[in-house]
């Protein structure tokens, strides 16, 4: 799997980004950061380039050959479905005043084309065999910059809550010759719970090529995780529809491939964070031989893109997509009796 991401932090005069690849438990990452003022009308940074080909429909992402890792690619990401706007996220500390996130995001599912070169081997990427998921968010994002040290202590730092989060866009494509249009299922579930309080949020639904959307009322994740590294290993999502009907989708993890987003600075990596000033231009990266080991996960954190297959138990339809997860605390039902 191939990953690409970038951020533009106007108030910090920073543009940063990353390009990476996951193959089984191996992972390669190239990161770059520069001063926004050096070229304010572009978000290209170091060997990373991003180009809008057709607004809200097709973009091009490029990682040029570089001296950091034996990885390069040039990919066009084309939507099979329209972009879909998610609900605003407004997360705050328990006082209700300080926001940890206040952001809007849209996502899109489709196919990819182009090429990838890894360790000297060139791989052709065709829309018949590669899919893409992408998202674009803006607003106040969590974990930007080095954590502040002069803030009121947050009770959740002393008594960490139980957390279960799953963000999963999945594309369903009719078999060849079957006719019909592609459709998607997008699920976003977020649960924070502590002594005397609980915050639970479900959003998402079914998305169609003509722009129609069928929302879900409630999501019940019945997932399983590996206690060694908190990797998703399987499970299902039970959906409650607005009319009270229920639908179950069985989840199957498609191997070990899945990019750990910590290497892209999500939640920080080796003391560095999104939007952090690294100088006029800074480029670095690394290779992990085994991202599944507890030592690697301790460095990278558990947050990762996981390639999954969803099966609609009612119709038998199969979809393939991404499932990002974060789980924290005591969850015996999820395979995490020790937290």
PLM feature segments, named:
Residues 1-339:
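Structured soluble/peripheral alpha/beta segments that form catalytic or ligand/cofactor-binding pockets
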């Amino acid at each position: 799997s191939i990953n690409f991401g970038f951020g533009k932090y106007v108030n910090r005069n920073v543009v940063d980004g990353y390009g990476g690849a996951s193959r089984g438990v191996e992972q390669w990452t190239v990161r770059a950061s520069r001063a926004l003022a050096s070229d304010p009308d572009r978000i290209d940074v170091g060997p990373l380039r991003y180009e809008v080909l057709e607004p809200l429909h097709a973009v091009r992402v490029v990682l040029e050959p570089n001296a950091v890792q034996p990885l390069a690619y040039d990919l066009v990401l084309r939507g099979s479905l329209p972009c879909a706007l998610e609900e605003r996220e407004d997360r705050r500390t328990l006082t209700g005043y300080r926001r940890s996130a206040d952001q809007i995001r849209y996502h899109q599912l489709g196919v990819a084309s182009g090429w990838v070169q890894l360790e000297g081997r060139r791989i052709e990427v065709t829309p018949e065999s590669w899919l893409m998921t992408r998202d674009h968010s803006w607003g106040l994002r969590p974990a930007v910059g080095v954590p502040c040290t002069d803030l009121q202590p947050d009770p959740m730092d002393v008594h960490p809550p139980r957390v279960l989060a799953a963000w999963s866009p999945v594309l369903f494509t009719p078999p060849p010759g079957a006719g019909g249009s592609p459709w998607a299922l997008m699920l976003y579930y977020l649960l924070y719970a502590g002594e005397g309080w609980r915050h639970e949020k479900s959003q998402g639904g079914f998305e169609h090529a003509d722009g129609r959307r069928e929302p879900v009322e409630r999501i019940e994740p019945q997932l399983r995780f590996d206690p060694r590294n908190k990797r998703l290993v399987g499970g299902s999502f039970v959906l409650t529809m607005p009319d009270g009907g229920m639908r179950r989708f069985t989840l199957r993890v498609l191997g070990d491939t899945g990019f750990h987003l910590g290497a892209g600075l999500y939640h920080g990596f080796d003391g560095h964070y999104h939007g952090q000033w690294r100088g006029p231009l800074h480029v670095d990266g690394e290779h992990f031989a085994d991202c599944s080991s507890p030592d690697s996960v301790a460095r990278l954190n558990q947050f990762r893109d996981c390639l999954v297959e969803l099966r609609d138990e009612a119709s038998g339809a199969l979809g393939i997509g991404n499932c990002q997860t974060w789980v924290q605390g005591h969850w015996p039902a999820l395979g995490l009796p020790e937290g």
